[in-house]
């Protein structure tokens, strides 16, 4: 038997970190068992589903490296097929037309709640005779068994049993003729020979209903594994209201690497000893469904930042270059050449946690000129600053060899000649050429800028200082 798992997102919103964790677990399990991973787009909700979200889901899965063996399949392409199956189920007495109005169902619900009962459909139309039909509008409901129970062994949570009397007759086709999620997913899992359904714990209540439909169709029952929720750092349900990044697109724009995200996400509910850093091959080797936690996991931004900086400094140069190219292009920064990007990683990688932070700092290298911050200039520059910058300009003007060693030697000799502290000289130069108070090694920054741009920045700073008033 070939192990087959699936990831079945609905394109009604951005790809969510919790959804990606589910996809990753399903992908890892399939790979660990030499099985297949299926991508299925559940787009029957035509009002909320969009092509833009579909493209975003597919692009982000590809970016993460979660490639699928089959698909993507689209439920919207199979609507007529689902309807034909439902028609046959009605003819076989496995489903029936329900003519109850929304008003009647609402009154029924309120009445049941007033009696302290769990609200569910009372099956009025299940035994309806033709002469009593007063409407042409209807939904189609599945004939759920009256007696017995549904028992399944969840690979994460163990044995789960639900009495059939607790379940109502599920709507499997809406009044507009569109089959419902709970029906389509069953047919797809059957037709695609899905052996293991790995999904969020919010689907546990759907499972007995889906099993009953599968049994009615004499189909094989897959093995289920319901993973726990992902919560915010303050243990709340993920929401835009708590200012938590939740979509993969947002993480990407913020400069997180796919390698660090996967490493971070896999640990939200799974572990292997005390190991923190996992390659994809190690994830596949060690992953089991039984090792997943039952309890919810909380996001940890500090952990993600730590992982991201690790991967920025340890990924192969060709890989990090590709990701930096994307980040620079997104920010409309025209970098000189690809070799520049690798120099930037070496220059800034140990100081910053995300690619976006590297890009933001790098603007000072690529902007035509520095937009000086008046507060920084007035706080850190004084009457000696003009003298320092003039000295540096004159010293570097005729320099023919441009490398870190030569720059360092010339900078040290300038400090000696000025008889001003190295700290003061370096701060003045740093602000003049980058606009920042902090920077990586100053000699490396000067070398990266190049002679012409470095001298131009010094001249611009001198011009700015000329118009400043210092206390005597």
From Swiss-Prot:
Annotated keywords: Aminoacyl-tRNA synthetase, ATP-binding, Cytoplasm, Ligase, Nucleotide-binding, Protein biosynthesis
Subcellular location per the Swiss-Prot or TrEMBL entry: Cytoplasm
Gene Ontology molecular-function annotations: ATP binding; glutamate-tRNA ligase activity; tRNA binding; zinc ion binding
Residues given in the record as ATP binding sites: 240
Residue ranges of the motif 'HIGH' region: 9-19
EC number: 6.1.1.17
Pfam families listed in its UniProt record: Anticodon_2, tRNA-synt_1c
Motif annotated as 'KMSKS' region, chain positions: 237-241
Keyword RNA-binding applies: no
Catalytic activity: tRNA(Glu) + L-glutamate + ATP = L-glutamyl-tRNA(Glu) + AMP + diphosphate
Main location: cytoplasm
Cellular component, GO annotation: cytosol
GO biological process, one term: glutamyl-tRNA aminoacylation
Domain of life: Bacteria
InterPro entries: aa-tRNA-synth_I_cd-bd, aa-tRNA-synth_I_codon-bd_sub2, aa_tRNA-synth_I_cd-bd_sf, Glu-tRNA-ligase_bac/mito, Glu/Gln-tRNA-synth, Glu/Gln-tRNA-synth_Ib_cat-dom, GluQ/Sye, GluRS_core
Family classification: Belongs to the class-I aminoacyl-tRNA synthetase family. Glutamate--tRNA ligase type 1 subfamily.
Quaternary data: Monomer.
Free-text function comment from the UniProt entry: Catalyzes the attachment of glutamate to tRNA(Glu) in a two-step reaction: glutamate is first activated by ATP to form Glu-AMP and then transferred to the acceptor end of tRNA(Glu).
Matching PANTHER family: GLUTAMATE--TRNA LIGASE, GLUTAMATE--TRNA LIGASE, MITOCHONDRIAL-RELATED
NCBIfam families: gltX_bact (TIGR00464)
Protein name: Glutamate--tRNA ligase
Annotated organism of origin: Buchnera aphidicola subsp. Baizongia pistaciae (strain Bp)
């Amino acid at each position: 038997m070939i192990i087959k798992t699936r990831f079945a997102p609905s394109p009604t919103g951005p790809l969510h970190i919790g959804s990606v964790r589910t996809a990753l677990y399903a992908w890892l399990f399939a790979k660990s068992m030499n099985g297949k991973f299926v991508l299925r787009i559940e787009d029957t909700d035509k009002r909320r589903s969009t092509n833009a979200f579909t493209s975003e889901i597919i692009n982000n899965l590809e970016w993460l490296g979660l490639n699928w063996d089959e698909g993507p399949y689209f439920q919207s392409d199979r609507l007529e097929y689902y309807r034909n199956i439902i028609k046959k189920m009605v003819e076989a007495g496995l489903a029936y037309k329900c003519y109850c109005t929304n008003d009647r169902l609402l009154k029924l619900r309120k009445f049941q709640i007033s009696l302290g009962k769990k609200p569910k459909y009372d099956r009025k139309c299940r035994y309806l005779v033709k002469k009593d039909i007063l409407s042409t509008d209807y939904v189609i409901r599945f004939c759920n068994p009256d007696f017995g129970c549904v028992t399944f062994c969840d690979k994460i949570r163990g044995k789960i049993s639900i009495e059939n009397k607790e379940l109502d007759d599920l709507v499997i086709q809406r009044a507009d003729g569109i089959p419902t999620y709970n029906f389509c997913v069953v047919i797809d899992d059957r037709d695609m020979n899905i052996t293991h359904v790995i999904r969020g714990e919010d689907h546990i209540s759907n499972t007995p209903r889906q099993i009953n439909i599968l049994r009615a169709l004499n189909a094989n029952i897959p093995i289920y594994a319901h993973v726990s929720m992902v919560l915010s750092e303050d243990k709340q349900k993920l929401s835009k209201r708590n200012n938590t990044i939740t979509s993969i697109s947002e993480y990407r724009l913020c400069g997180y690497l796919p390698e660090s995200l996967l490493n971070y996400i896999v640990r939200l509910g799974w572990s292997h000893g005390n190991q923190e850093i996992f390659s994809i091959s190690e994830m596949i080797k060690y992953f089991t469904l039984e090792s997943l936690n039952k309890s919810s996991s909380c996001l940890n931004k500090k952990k993600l930042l730590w992982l991201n900086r690790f991967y920025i400094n340890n990924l192969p140069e060709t890989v990090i270059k590709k990701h930096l190219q994307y980040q620079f292009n997104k920010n409309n920064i025209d970098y000189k050449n690809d070799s520049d990007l690798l120099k930037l990683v070496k220059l800034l990688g140990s100081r910053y946690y995300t690619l976006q932070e590297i890009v933001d700092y790098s603007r000072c290298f690529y902007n035509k000129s520095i937009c000086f911050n008046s507060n920084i200039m007035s706080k850190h520059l004084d009457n000696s600053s003009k003298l320092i910058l003039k000295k540096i300009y004159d010293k570097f003007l005729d320099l023919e060899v441009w490398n870190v060693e030569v720059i360092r030697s010339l900078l040290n000799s300038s400090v000696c000649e000025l008889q001003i502290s190295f700290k003061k000289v370096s701060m003045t130069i740093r602000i003049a050429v980058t606009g920042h108070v902090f920077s990586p090694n100053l000699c490396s920054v000067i070398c990266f800028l190049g002679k012409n741009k470095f001298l131009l920045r010094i001249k611009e700073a001198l011009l700015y200082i000329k118009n400043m008033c210092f206390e005597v």
